């Protein structure tokens, strides 16, 4: 697992990006967010996640809010 901070997240479109210190930003889709109910992230929120190879490159998986 890796830690990062939410750079931005668009609730209407259901995706955004996570900043990783010393690395490239990682795409995140709402389906990758762990937990029940409405799945959303807030700008600046700390998260833990795994990186997997998606159709268009690296993306976050198993995203957990810290």
Swiss-Prot record:
Q: Which Pfam families match?
A: CSD
Q: Which residues form the signal peptide?
A: none
The UniProt entry, under SMART domains, shows: CSP
Expression induction or repression: In response to low temperature.
Q: Name one GO biological process term.
A: regulation of gene expression
Q: Where is this chain's protein located in or outside the cell?
A: Cytoplasm
- Judging by the UniProt lineage, the source's domain of life is Bacteria
- Outline the extent of the CSD domain: 4-63
Q: How does a null allele present?
A: A double cshB-cspD mutant grows slowly at 15 degrees Celsius.
Q: What is this protein called?
A: Cold shock protein CspD
Origin organism is Bacillus subtilis (strain 168)
């Amino acid at each position: 697992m890796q830690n990062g901070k939410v750079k931005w997240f668009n609730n209407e479109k259901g995706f955004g990006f996570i900043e990783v210190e010393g690395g490239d930003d990682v795409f995140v889709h709402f389906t990758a967010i762990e937990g029940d109910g409405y799945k959303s992230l807030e700008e600046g929120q700390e998260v833990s996640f795994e990186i997997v190879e998606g159709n268009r490159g690296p993306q976050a998986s198993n995203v957990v809010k810290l």
